[in-house]
Amino acid sequence: MQPLDAVYLQILKNLCTDLSEPVPLDGVDPSALYRLAEKHCSLPFLLPYFEQQPQFSALKQQTKQMLLSYYQLEHFTRLTFSLLLAEKIPCFLLKGISLAANYPIPEYRKLGDLDLYIPEKDAFSRACRILNAHGYTEEPEESDHHVTYRFTFPETGRSFTLELHYRIVGIYQFSRANELVDEIFSASHLKPSFVELYGQTYPVLPPTENVFYMLHHMLKHYLYSGFGSRLLCDFTLYLERYASEVNFEKIHFWCRESKIFHLYDYK
């Protein structure tokens, strides 16, 4: 392992395990470390180690932009949920601010778009009509598991993306995996858990189902575009918080049945 990678991983380890071990930057190019963290959307994690580095000012500026984007997406999440819940449309918040809540500083987890899952077909169709009626514009995209919408706040001109999922993940070539995923994440099977974020209560996947979803989500990223440290941090921090509520026997069985056991190390 290269020294640069070792230093970066130690910084992530400190974050994910709540450690405060010193991470000397001797022998590591700070500019290269900055670029690596930027590539993995984790620049704010460098703040405790970069106070004496020439990149510190740029690092603080980038962090401020991430904080602004975080709260803007939180507002977009709240707005979208309020529209759907007002019409009694059952939906689940995937990833996003629900995973960021597990970080020591949630705002340091970079957010991209908003992902919602609606397992009921009729409810999904109703949701699409409601979104269209409230200024959400459907974006052309080839997807086998979600519809993409774009919403622009007229006051600021800032636009945000919503991925509205009718399947939890894309379709596999292995039919048994599709059958199992459809069964586990069906409307009849799923019973929501709830998290309170900034005074708003959101329905989310139960811990066992969420771990299984995150494994499939990581696999899809690995197969099509690769994945970086953010997904691993998400997974680690989620398990740190919810491991006692996860049925690992079920995870073990589901992973074997869907042929993704190579991504899951059962201990």
Task: Describe the residue ranges of each PLM region.
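Conserved NTP-donor binding/palm subdomain of two-metal-ion nucleotidyltransferases/polymerases, i.e.
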Residues: 1-112, 118-267
